[in-house]
């Protein structure tokens, strides 16, 4: 990554409440193979979703402060709850660029929808913050947003990583082997059937853990979404 026309070899900081942000880190490595990363998975305080947003904001500032002390040149908050709770505060408080994951997801949903009916699944804190609904409507006020808190998906994703044998390098393979289980499908149906009945044609996975569950979610929500 170049800064003022010259390459800056400092690492990029990436953090999440646990394993989920590795899905974002993986995409950064694919897009920027020459960059080095420092990843923080705050598994000691995972999940963030049930916590008060002010508490999560405190976690965000603490982790950003540590990453800045390590000499990172920018920070990616690879957690939707943390983005909703602390991105704006962190951007004002630190000199390095800090980006989150809500706005890119909202823009992708606006561009993808054909019928203007978008579903959002995320943690309780992210849904209650209104971050995605507000971001989507800011881009296109004509879109109807249906939001559902799906906190048990984080638990399933974290359990699946721990159940996997060997290094987790192929998330698609992991999803098909670990997450397609009857008990998990029942939970997914309880969460997703109401959204499907709302007629959505686009679903935002508003938590970085959720791409691990794409096969499970896709099997329930249907190919038309």
Enumerate the language-model features and the residues they cover.
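Non-catalytic structural scaffold of enzyme domains
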Residues: 1-225
């Amino acid at each position: 990554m170049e800064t003022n026309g010259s390459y800056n070899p400092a690492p990029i900081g990436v953090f999440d409440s646990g394993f989920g942000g590795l899905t974002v880190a993986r995409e950064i490595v694919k897009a920027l193979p020459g960059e080095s990363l420092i990843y923080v998975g705050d598994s000691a305080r995972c999940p963030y979703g049930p916590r008060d947003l002010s508490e999560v904001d405190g976690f965000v500032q603490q982790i950003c402060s540590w990453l800045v002390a390590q000499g990172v040149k920018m920070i990616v908050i690879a957690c939707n709850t943390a983005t909703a709770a602390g991105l704006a505060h962190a951007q004002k408080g630190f000199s390095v660029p800090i980006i989150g994951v809500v706005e890119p997801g909202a823009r992708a949903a606006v561009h993808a929808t054909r019928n203007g009916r978008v579903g959002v699944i995320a943690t309780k804190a992210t849904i209650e913050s209104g971050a995605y609904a507000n971001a989507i409507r800011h881009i296109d006020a004509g879109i109807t947003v249906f939001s559902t808190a799906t906190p048990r998906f984080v638990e399933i994703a974290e359990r699946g990583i721990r159940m996997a044998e060997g290094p987790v390098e192929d998330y698609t393979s992991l999803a098909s082997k670990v997450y397609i289980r009857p008990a998990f499908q029942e939970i997914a149906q309880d969460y997703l059937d109401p959204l499907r009945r709302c007629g959505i044609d686009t679903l935002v996975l508003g938590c970085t853990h959720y791409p691990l569950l794409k096969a499970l979610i896709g099997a329930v929500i249907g190919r038309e979404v």
